[in-house]
Amino acid sequence: AFQGCAKLADINLSASLAGIGTGAFDGTAWLNAQPDGVVYLSTFAYKYKGTMAEGTTLALLDGTTDVCGRAFNNCWNLAGIDLPESLKTIGKEAFSGTGLLSVSLPSRIDSTGEGAFSGCDKLVSATLPENLTTIPASMFSRCYALAAISIPASVEYIGNEAFYSCLGLKEITSFNPVPPVCEPFYGENWTMVFDGVNPEHCTLKIPTGSTTSYAAAVGWDMFYLCEEFDPSGIQGVLKGKASGKTVHYDLNGRMILSNAKGIHIVREADGSCRKIWVK
């Protein structure tokens, strides 16, 4: 909107502003005057400015609601990002091409742009919030190191090429007994959501009784290494109380050794839970 307005030095945003377009204030006097680091506009993380040191880990400010499109695009040296619980929106290609090793999306996220983490070839794990309804197109495309992904029961739709060329994907866990719709490729009766994932080496874990539905669903029908699990076992783990020690569970809520291969539900000593992938 104001890109290239070289004399624009001051910006005041309305509290009702819904979003800021990618690069909207690039090439302005305002941006040139900002110090190096994460540049903020009100509650928006607009972009990263300056040179980033290798192995950088950043924590966005509490109260940040939006990460603008391409805000950290091609920040190769960004190895970690701490996203605050206040965050609601991640823009298109916001973290594409970064060196992130893992990412955990906060629970209030309700909108994620296409290709948000595309090309993050070092990304090993990603945690999606339980209220997410859509995984947008190309969200994790070309994340070659991504070993496992857990798709919440709330997810109903997965955009085209969301997991395109995720060559290292060994385990997909979908908690929805109804297969999420995989976006068709330009109106065709096939999809590229999982194109490049090797079905010979990737296990699909799905709720008990849903094998027939997944086997008949476009996109999901490519997987033949399928295992059913009882989601209620995990719910029991998540609702349990703190025990004062760290305990590992499988997807059926059964206690397992900490070095067992696959997806673990880890209940920490304080009662908090997280999902991890053990190779």
Which residues make up each language-model segment?
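Consensus positions within tandem repeat domains that build extended binding/scaffold surfaces
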Residues: A1-Q3, T22-D26, G69-A71, G91-A94, ...
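Short, conserved loop/helix-junction motifs that constitute active-site signature segments
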Residues: C166, Y186-E200
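Structural signature of tandem-repeat unit edges
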Residues: C5-G19, T28-S42, G50-D66, W76-T89, ...
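A recurrent domain-boundary module in secreted/ectodomain proteins
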Residues: A216-G233
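Short loop/turn microsegments at loop-to-beta-strand junctions
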Residues: Q34-P35, S243-T246, G262
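Residue-level detector of functionally pivotal "anchor" positions at catalytic/ligand-binding pockets or at interdomain
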Residues: D230-N252
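C-terminal tail/sorting-segment detector
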Residues: I263-K279
